[in-house]
Amino acid sequence: MSAQAAERDLTAIIGLEVHVQLETDTKIFCGCSTDTDDADPNTHTCPVCLGLPGALPTLNEGAVEAAVKLGKAIDADIPERTRFHRKNYFYPDLPKGFQITQYDAPICQDGELEVGTADDRRAIGIERAHLEEDPGSLQHVGGSIEDADYTLVDYNRAGTPLMEIVTRPDFRAAEEVRSFLAKLTSVLEYLGVFDAERDGSLRVDANISMVDSAELAGEGGPSDDVLEAANRTEVKNISSHRAAQKALAYETTRQRNQLERGMAVAQETRHWDEARGVTVSMRSKEEEKDYRYFREADIPPLEVSDWKDEIPIPELPDARRERFRTEYGVGDETASKLTSRKAVADLFEELADEYDAALAATWVADNVLGELNYRDLSLDDVADRDDEFERLVELVAEDEITAKNAEEVVLRTMLDEDRAPDEIVDAEGLGKTSGDAVADAVAEAIAENPDAVADYHDGEGDALNFLVGQVMAKTGGSADPGQVNELLRDELAQA
């Protein structure tokens, strides 16, 4: 590596094409069900989604409403009229030989989505968002896309409504991309148009170039000349927030190393290999002209202006976070955790309205989410247990068990063994110990630890904590720590 090459100060320019499957009962241009997760291959198909001659598409109104909701959420321009085009290319998962999509008149244009914290926020530009149909899915048998023995095609997915969201090249690091995707999917989930838990519901194509940092000086982002001069690599097969961060971190490093060695970066499409943690060259990158777009004659232009104002949107994550801060007194970091997923926010609000808001925030944001994250689960995976989480918080709020036992024993056992809170409390004898039993444990702790008693009288602060721990151990953690502390002080004053 030459000294001159090693001194180059390079910055990544990253833009995204995010494909999200919309939550509709039927496909975008036919009446086939989209509920295909457990279906046998090629059983949710019809002449329309198989592209048979003479089959005519009928636009799904629910998909259009979902797109309008997103447009409102990102403050995009929703034109009065939109239309569809055919994007022509050959691939086995596309039975018609073209994809019905939108080209020069997308349903949403010029929006933005804010990311970051309350003290450090910035807007990511969204150039456009348009509707299109999902292709079928490929199953590579005996290997990956590079070395499979053969590939099978399942057309159950063909025709599932997709929203493609195209950002401006506003990202400079892989971590920013992950943050944006988390925020975007949260907004879509709040809108009720996206199921984050559904396999394959999110797919990301990322375009990345490396340029000299000096070319990015000033405001307004990279100029058109800078973007034109930089060879752009597209990375496909990204299916999660985490994969996006890994893939772009790898690709940034790969391109940086090539440029610093004086090598050119090819304009190509690369495949993210999740198992190996690398991107692999697939083909030279297509240009827009390669797709030979022309209007879809079987779907007339769509007039959106007549009814777009009648489509409501619910409270979104940012507004809900701010309301949690003002209405419940929750800190910004905790409020962000609580509103990151709609199911989490709903659980917190239900508990906060019934019990103490601070207790509810601690339990949901720290205890429940922390335990689920440790198990690589989400609240959706245990959605049928909301009543049990509420009962556990009630036991703590009503002073029936200690917070320590609730977190360290009951919650973990609930998740490990699929048992109800009351059953665990009874079986493990975790009900709070009180009255004479606590007084006896206090007396025993004082009698058995004369050195700690002496240290307490000598002003050693840790001595009291030690004695509290001894009492808690004798009661199996079921005594109230505050009561134990008070009883110990009273008894030690007389010792």
From Swiss-Prot:
UniProt keyword annotation of Cytoplasm present: no
Alphabetized InterPro entries for the sequence: Asn/Gln-tRNA_amidoTrfase_suB/E (IPR017959), Asn/Gln-tRNA_Trfase_suB/E_cat (IPR006075), Asn/Gln_amidotransferase (IPR018027), Asn/Gln_tRNA_amidoTrase-B-like (IPR003789), GatB (IPR004413), GatB_C_1 (IPR042114), GatB_Yqey_C_2 (IPR023168), Gln-tRNA_amidoTrfase_suB_CS (IPR017958)
GO terms for MF: asparaginyl-tRNA synthase (glutamine-hydrolyzing) activity; ATP binding; glutaminyl-tRNA synthase (glutamine-hydrolyzing) activity
Entry-linked SMART domains: GatB_Yqey (SM00845)
Coiled-coil intervals: none
Keywords, in A-Z order: ATP-binding, Ligase, Nucleotide-binding, Protein biosynthesis
Pfam families: GatB_N, GatB_Yqey
Annotated family: Belongs to the GatB/GatE family. GatB subfamily.
Subunit structure: Heterotrimer of A, B and C subunits.
Protein name according to UniProt: Aspartyl/glutamyl-tRNA(Asn/Gln) amidotransferase subunit B
Gene that specifies this protein: gatB
